[in-house]
């Protein structure tokens, strides 16, 4: 219970809240950014729900276990198009766009296709680290972008 709360519910819930706060920052952005943010917000909700619906190794066919697996799939399936839409919507910020596209491709590779044998735990943890790191950088970039008026020069020191 405590592991699920600390590993899934708390971080996913905080990212869900962060995405909701970012909505103000992107309300003047193009639709790609707004839709991308909505999809990555859904990804954060699915991540948090993995902790609410624990995976039981003894009863993999149980309803809670099936729902946990469904939330795990929704986590990365919602993230990929969300990150790619944010990359397309932030083309003027080349670094952010390239990073979003790269992470959007790497997360499912690490979460789904790389976990074989010894790599199972490590690959999934790397996918989580990439996902969390992406959230931190994108949040910072979107907040900094919204701090200046439209069509003005970027904030000083950036």
Q: Model features per residue range: what roles?
A:
Residues 37-52, 99-110:
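Small-polar-interrupted transmembrane alpha-helices in polytopic inner-membrane proteins
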Residues 1-13:
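Interfacial helix-start motif at the membrane-water boundary
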Residues 2, 27-34, 59-66, 91, ...:
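Juxtamembrane loop-transmembrane helix junctions in multi-pass integral membrane proteins
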Residues 45-88:
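Membrane-proximal helix-loop-helix units in multi-pass membrane proteins
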Residues 150-157:
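Short, intrinsically disordered C-terminal tails of secreted or membrane-associated proteins
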Residues 86-150:
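Terminal transmembrane helical module of multi-pass membrane proteins
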Residues 11-27:
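Transmembrane alpha-helical segments in integral membrane proteins
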Residues 26-41, 94-99:
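Interfacial segments of alpha-helical transmembrane regions
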